[in-house]
Amino acid sequence: MGVSGSKGQKLFVSVLQRLLSERGLHVKESSAIEFYQFLIKVSPWFPEEGGLNLQDWKRVGREMKKYAAEHGTDSIPKQAYPIWLQLREILTEQSDLVLLSAEAKSVTEEELEEGLTGLLSASSQEKTYGTRGTAYAEIDTEVDKLSEHIYDEPYEEKEKADKNEEKDHVRKVKKIVQRKENSEHKRKEKDQKAFLATDWNNDDLSPEDWDDLEEQAAHYHDDDELILPVKRKVDKKKPLALRRKPLPPVGFAGAMAEAREKGDLTFTFPVVFMGESDDDDTPVWEPLPLKTLKELQSAVRTMGPSAPYTLQVVDMVASQWLTPSDWHQTARATLSPGDYVLWRTEYEEKSKETVQKTAGKRKGKVSLDMLLGTGQFLSPSSQIKLSKDVLKDVTTNAVLAWRAIPPPGVKKTVLAGLKQGNEESYETFISRLEEAVYRMMPRGEGSDILIKQLAWENANSLCQDLIRPMRKTGTMQDYIRACLDASPAVVQGMAYAAAMRGQKYSTFVKQTYGGGKGGQGSEGPVCFSCGKTGHIKRDCKEEKGSKRAPPGLCPRCKKGYHWKSECKSKFDKDGNPLPPLETNAENSKNLVKGQSPSPTQKGDKGKDSGLNPEAPPFTIHDLPRGTPGSAGLDLSSQKDLILSLEDGVSLVPTLVKGTLPEGTTGLIIGRSSNYKKGLEVLPGVIDSDFQGEIKVMVKAAKNAVIIHKGERIAQLLLLPYLKLPNPIIKEERGSEGFGSTSHVHWVQEISDSRPMLHISLNGRRFLGLLDTGADKTCIAGRDWPANWPIHQTESSLQGLGMACGVARSSQPLRWQHEDKSGIIHPFVIPTLPFTLWGRDIMKEIKVRLMTDSPDDSQDL
């Protein structure tokens, strides 16, 4: 029945008493409770899984019989068998005699029906005059015997004895019917012969006839149940079975039917519209399938209220047209108390929005009481009168409120905390984002705009770099396509390719992945005036009055037309020596206006990929300050560089030379803005007697980083220091500075007798040495394809010798050997006679160093 506990007991007792009372049987409440407790003891599955149907009830009977055989008949309550038989008769809509005859396997259903029909026909025709005939008395006797057999001991006798006894009773019934039919036939033949032998012309009767006539007349009015003789037809036909009045519904459905007749509509859900058109709003009430509610509760308990399967079950429930009261009962029964409060709050908000949207749009006004089931629509009987349009709004708001319930553990700031992980693919992140957004609002233009905005803001830094060029013009498909292969290796390769083509990283990404209507390569020409794409210089609409006027006569040397800050003269026009140029204040002003302090720092980015040999070195006095109150002097890169995580620490040249002011020492620190972009500057100390070029130690903190020529990367702080009489190792520092960094070592000599191995790089076979002990793979210059891009590095190789002018591949290469493969960034050395396979490949292909002693063998 689906209900257990005290509530299930009360429901079963009330239904049992009502069903038996309709048959004229009264069962005490104590007897009904005793039977229910015995039923739970015999069939514990019935309260939860069973129902009042013939199949389950027969199963209960079999288990009662088994229980009696094991524990004895005394263990069964006195009223158990009568109650069980009465309910079985109700469920099958048959009499006790038919039930008993149907259980006899040797008697077919057709024979049983024919025998019963003849029995009833013979008994009805036996009534002639006076009292009831002897046939009725004999039939009643047999029926009483059969009834006693049914109610007294239906299961105590053995199966074989039961069948034999049932056969005997059926044979007796047939004999009674046949005997009465033969007697009736003989009597009619005798009356017909006497009628034909009568002389109708002679009115005189014999004395015996007159005596017989007077005797019959004396008893003419003795019996009130006078039945006139009916002439039987020659062709005997089987009488039609009487149509019985259908029994009322049983079980929980019957209880609800009785409640509807009395006006109690508490359980009248869902409201089903049976009309063929939308205009037919005649409601019919059906119980919501119990299995559906169980499935919904199980899904909420095991997977959560916001799981996709749970939402699918909610949509199935929503197809049943529930009223506001029904939705509240369903949510309260399946959700946790906290989630129910969230659902109710969201449902009320959605209902208020619906009332505001539908105001003045419909003929029938929709009120908040209709949607919430409050006020005059508080009772379920008033809610069933709601129109179909109102019930649609109720269902829509209820489903949206359910979808707004957050997953377990995420109660607030769902969208703000939905970030893409560093190793998470972009398409997986978009899937989680769409699920969260659609749980809060329906699909539409508003949800698409929100998803696109969050797809950019909540993406990781790598995907943001890929999306940034197409953020405003691209679609979600462009975003996903741009981040399809997002990985640090891909970004590094794209940065190398952009540097080789002399383009900005953002421009290269936009041209590679598209990002708008024109697709790849649709940016158009670049304006040389404003730097924007889509037009040329002569069509530029930017203001042209902001150009800087040409310089006049230099006020410092008075020998040429150039700016004072760019004056390099050491003598004026009269030959007098000039003092050092005071550039701090001047450069500060120029920096505010956007003017670079030196020719090198104002050079065009990307045009010069190396050092400018014609530019003289700068001194400490030439370095600018960001603002008048800046504590540090800005150090700028004088070379375009691309840094990756595998490059480690690199040295960036600044072309700044000369000794520091007396009594000071220098401290190099980074800039916070560069660190946010992924560039990490290692602090360094510049001695007061250092006369060489100041270089900055940098490395990539997160992903590949591009440093443009003239870009400010670090600051130089001039600090006073205290001299102590400590021992001095060297008299002067001179120009000696940093040593070699990012070394790649090999420790064995190279000869032709070494073992060689063929490995494919991007589909091209290379032959190289195995036992060199190199940490990184080094490709010989003669083996490197000319069309594969490379770039120079600041690293050098050390081993038995020294290799300078080392280059590196500008793109990641995929190597493959048999079933093994991977990604490497090899070095390219022009002077190397052989290609050297490093540990970055050998450890992946499981190369082992073997000796005669197994203990000394190890994997690379």
Curated annotation (Swiss-Prot):
Cofactor: how bound: Magnesium ions are required for NC-dUTPase activity.
Ranges for region Disordered = 154-193, 572-631
**Motif PTAP/PSAP motif mapped to chain:** 305-308
Q: Cellular component terms, GO, for this chain's entry?
A: viral nucleocapsid
Question: Species name for this entry?
Answer: Mouse mammary tumor virus (strain C3H)
**Ranges of Basic and acidic residues composition bias in the record:** 154-169, 178-193
Q: Where is this site: Cleavage?
A: 99-100, 195-196, 228-229, 254-255, 269-270, 496-497, 745-746
Q: Could you tell me what this protein is called?
A: Gag-Pro polyprotein
Catalytic site residues?
771
